[in-house]
Amino acid sequence: MKVQIIAVGTELLLGDTLDTNSNYLSIKMRELGFDVYKRVVVGDNYDRLYKEIEEGLQQNDLIITTGGLGPTEDDITKKCCCDCLGKKMVLNEKSYAKLRKYFNEDEKAIQGNIKQCMFPEDAIVFENFNGTADCALIENNGKRILFLPGPPAEMKPIYENQVQQVLEQFATDCIISETLNISILGEWDMNERVKDIIESSNNPTVAPYFKKDKRILRITAKASDRQTALDMIAKKKQELRDRLGMYVFGENDETIEESVYKVLKEHDLSIMTSESITGGMIASKLVNVSGVSDYLKRSLVVYSNEAKIELLGVKAETIDTYGVVSENVAFEMVERMFEKFNVDCSISTTGFASGENAGLVYVGLGYKNTIKTLKLQLHGERNKIRNRVSNRALAELRLMILENVSRETF
């Protein structure tokens, strides 16, 4: 099935609002085996939208619009669709009853919003449980138009809970993609380890790419139904996991901090951070994960030399002899955490986020009194460096824990 997606709204053209809906819908169409041939943004202009829908119907089987379903004069999507298909607008009684209840029988408010209850005749209407603008699917001579709400918080639930199961009736193939997230390994190293798997995989296919400091392997399967595609992906994911081992830290949207939390929880380990260059960012990432309070026992921001000495107990002579940004200081920061606070795992960071030596960082890692340090030389602006250090430190600690637990098991 050929698909065109039309995002409606002048605010999108002006850059005031980002069109995330089209990207989301492209992924969903791919999963159904539908081919998205065109995506376009159109302002709140009747003539231009009419022309886009008219031409789209000539070239595609399904037009999906987002936005323009509100009660005001510039909400023109439904009228354009009706005019293109030669259909009348009729009142949907269920939507009307919902509107009356929403406005508590306030007749003035109801009449001001009644446009949202008008739909093309013979349309399948989907109730919007997160807003007042219901949406619909209409069909005419084998062509279909689906119009969805503009706000993503309304559009996504209505698509996933109602629309998708209707569109699945028209699907002949199902295309699904899932990803494996890989830490620490560089692009070349990762590719070398799985190069033969990538080259020999046709269905599912395996494609490597980078996204926000993550190495990602995307596995895409095409099958007659969703479950078959998922089974194919699961088998390929296991093959890749067997090859990459502990470097795989999660799937799809899972973050490194979520993966670290799982490891801490599984092995009942406490953790502490003492951060200089990262300024609490590592702890902040961990705190984003629900339940981590059971394992994150303390976090210190020791940005100044005085803080490292007074709060943590780093020796002044260590800083004077080796410099505050040094392997020795990172090591001693971890050592003092074990001595003073009795935790199972610890992370320390010290480095330069700007200036002549920007990107030079030392990370200290500790697991049950075993300590190691890591030297990093990173590039980029200040906050990018801090974020990369935080992610790398968490990834390295996770690997350190797993390697030690594995040795303890045997």
Swiss-Prot record:
Pfam families: CinA, CinA_KH, MoCF_biosynth. SMART domains: MoCF_biosynth (SM00852). Transmembrane segments: none annotated. It comes from the Bacteria. Belongs to the CinA family. This is Putative competence-damage inducible protein. It comes from Finegoldia magna (strain ATCC 29328 / DSM 20472 / WAL 2508) (Peptostreptococcus magnus).
